[in-house]
Every structure is written in structure tokens, then in C-alpha cells.
């Protein structure tokens, strides 16, 4: 589902999947908190390449966040476990940066009808307080900071392309960069092996997500970089996220890392 919001200047701003997911998440948790309805064992799910603004929102509301490999089926697996495994928790909301959203756990895949309903509810909810969705986004930024992300894809076709993609992934694992654009890498995660190196703590740990051919770098300034081969196309995909106090500072960080 796509979404555009009207700004104060009357122009429309088309939101990314990450911004929509964050907006719906903030609305859902805000409304549930007002009613005292956030489950004590409630959890939110998102793919590992989706915005870390969701992490900040969940931390604000004291709700557990679970990350998954890319592909909504992995979020669906968590929903299934919430129904079949005692003590696993109660699913609240899940999303991917690729415009997939789901609440409630009645379905097992991203649901545009459900997402459109939530967006309409959010409009009414904020309008009842004299606010717009644009105001709500500003409220989130004031509370959690400004976050933005970028994705770059490199098409590498044929047998040579497959070999180049495999070679790039192997190089990142064997000769791991320790900095990007002068910013130190605090943590490196290899999601295929499930191992991670926490450079800040000086010890090896486990990656947040496993079972995925991807690597992730967490930088000392809060930015992150994830690299993975596409599962459906001959592409190497690069995901970058950053956060700062202002949108201008975030864009500057992203441009530096790109």
C-alpha cells in the first residue's frame, strides 16, 4: 500500500514504505496505550532491512521488536508461532520497507486492505486532535529523531554476474571493512553463519537474524549498511539507514555513505 500526506504548504509528500510502517506503528501503539490495551507479551515484527525508527518507537512504548530475514513469509512464521507456541507472545503489527503491512494476525501475508483501513483510522484519530498525518510524522521525529533510508541495486546478469555477486559477498566476509566514509564499524553481522563481531565490546556474538545470505554493518554514529543478493533478480542490493536530529543532517549522512 502506498500513502501520500498533505504538507502545510498544500503539496503532497509521497511516503516510503519505512515511513508508512513507522506511522502506522506509532498510531497503533498510541491508540492501544490510551486504552491500556498493549499486551504485556506483545511484539512487533519487521524485516532486518527496514527502518530502525521502528526500534525507537517500540522502545518508547516498551514493546518487544523482532527482526526477520527479508520476505513477509518470515513475519508470517512469527505470527503462526504466536498462535501455536505458548509464551511466544502476542503479535501486534508487522511491516517491510517494500510497502508490506499487517496487523492483528488474522492473515499470514501483507494485507493492503488492512493497511488502508489503518491509514484511514490514523487520519481520523489525528484529525480528532486537530492534527494531520504530517503532524504525526513530525511528532514521531520530535520524539525519536529523524530517520531515513536508501536502497541501491546493482544489476549483474549472466554467469559472470552471479560470480561477481558471490565474490563481492565473499570479500565482505573475508576482508571486512572497519569503517565507511571515516565512520567506524561498531558491529559486523554475517546472517548466513549467524555470527557477529562486536568490535566495540571486543567479542564475538550472534547476529540478530540468521538464515539469510546478507551482511550488516552497524556504525558508531547510528547508521547501518546491509548488503545482500536479490532472491528474485540478478542484483546485488545495498541498504543504508541513518538517523540524526534534523532531516538535513540525515540526508548528509546518507549522501556521505552512498
Predicted regions and their residues:
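Phosphate-binding and adjacent anionic-ligand microenvironments
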Residues: 3-13, 31-228, 235-239, 246-254, ...
Amino acid at each position: 500500500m502506498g500513502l501520500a500526506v498533505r504538507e502545510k504548504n498544500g503539496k503532497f509528500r509521497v511516503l516510503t514504505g519505512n515511513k508508512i510502517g513507522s506511522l502506522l506503528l506509532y498510531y497503533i501503539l498510541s491508540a492501544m496505550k490510551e486504552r491500556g490495551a498493549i499486551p504485556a507479551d506483545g511484539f512487533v515484527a519487521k524485516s532486518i532491512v527496514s527502518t530502525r525508527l521502528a526500534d525507537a518507537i517500540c522502545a518508547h512504548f516498551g514493546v518487544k521488536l523482532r527482526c526477520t530475514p527479508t520476505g513477509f513469509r518470515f513475519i508470517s512464521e512469527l505470527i503462526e508461532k504466536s498462535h501455536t507456541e505458548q509464551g511466544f507472545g502476542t503479535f501486534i503489527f508487522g511491516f517491510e520497507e517494500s510497502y508490506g503491512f499487517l496487523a492483528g494476525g488474522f492473515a499470514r501475508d501483507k494485507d493492503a486492505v488492512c493497511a488502508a483501513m489503518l491509514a484511514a483510522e490514523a487520519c481520523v484519530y489525528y484529525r480528532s486532535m486537530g492534527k494531520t498525518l504530517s503532524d504525526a510524522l513530525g511528532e514521531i521525529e520530535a520524539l525519536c529523531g529523524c530517520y531515513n533510508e536508501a536502497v541501491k541495486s546493482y544489476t549483474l546478469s549472466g554467469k559472470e554476474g552471479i560470480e561477481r555477486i558471490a565474490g563481492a559477498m565473499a570479500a565482505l566476509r573475508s576482508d571486512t571493512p572497519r569503517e565507511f566514509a571515516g565512520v567506524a564499524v561498531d558491529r559486523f553481522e554475517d546472517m548466513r553463519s549467524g555470527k557477529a563481531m562486536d568490535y566495540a565490546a571486543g567479542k564475538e556474538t550472534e547476529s540478530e537474524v540468521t538464515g539469510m545470505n546478507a551482511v550488516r554493518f552497524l556504525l558508531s554514529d547510528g547508521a547501518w549498511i546491509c548488503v545482500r543478493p536479490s532472491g528474485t533478480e540478478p542484483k546485488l542490493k545495498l541498504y543504508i539507514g541513518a538517523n540524526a536530529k534534523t532531516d538535513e543532517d540525515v540526508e548528509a549522512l546518507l549522501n556521505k555513505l552512498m
